[in-house]
Amino acid sequence: MKLLVSPINSEEAIIASIGGADIVDVKNPKEGSLGANFPWVIREVKAVVNGRQPISATIGDFNYKPGTAALAALGAAVAGADYIKVGLYDIQTESQALELLTKITRAVKDYNPLKKVVASGYSDYKRINSISPLLLPAVAAEAGVDVVMVDTGVKDGKSTFEFMDEKELKEFTDLAHSYGLENAIAGSLKFEDIPLLERIGPDIIGVRGMVCGGDRSTSIRQELVEKLVAECQA
């Protein structure tokens, strides 16, 4: 499994990079689960990582606003992100998801076809009034997305595993692979979840709180990144 670590600034990005993360992800927790950070922060992170890892950037937890989302996605791509991540938050139907993701993908790929688009559903979709992550792989594949992900929409300490069980997450992973997509799992993951994640088999796991010592509002610690890298590679 690849490890995606989400710093909030260039100082944390250096720690994540030196610690051995496979992907350095720029987000802004103050603005939500997949809260967008500023273009200059993406550029700063890109500069300090200096090619050691690809950079991903979140553009927000989006309801049905394809134009706004497409423009935000292009902004993240221009700022230097290699992966552009969008959360489908309060998306009511598969047709809404398809249009949103199609427009985002076009905005990114017209600029640079080598950049990857990541579509995230939410394990707690029922409490945020959005579509099931199990519907996402088929829609994402049709839209030309590269990676599908599941995360928690509400960051209250509850884990993805409290909303989707091993069977459902395995189904999500297998569906993604059946459509030729990479997939990722995130959402208040803990070190003790690693054996379960290995059974499920995602390509990528996404973390912040786990490498902050359990509190995503504190700072990333290099020794915890290194510990997690070792466990993911074991």
Swiss-Prot record:
Keyword check for Lyase: yes
Name of the protein: (5-formylfuran-3-yl)methyl phosphate synthase
Family from the record: Belongs to the MfnB family.
UniProt pathway: Cofactor biosynthesis; methanofuran biosynthesis
Function per UniProt: Catalyzes the formation of 4-(hydroxymethyl)-2-furancarboxaldehyde phosphate (4-HFC-P) from two molecules of glyceraldehyde-3-P (GA-3-P).
GO biological process: methanofuran biosynthetic process
Catalytic-site annotation from UniProt: K27 (schiff-base intermediate with substrate), K85 (proton acceptor)
Keywords: Lyase, Schiff base
Gene: mfnB
EC number(s) recorded for this UniProt protein: 4.2.3.153
Molecular function in Gene Ontology: carbon-carbon lyase activity
Coiled coil (residue ranges): none
Reactions accelerated catalytically: 2 D-glyceraldehyde 3-phosphate = 4-(hydroxymethyl)-2-furancarboxaldehyde phosphate + phosphate + 2 H2O
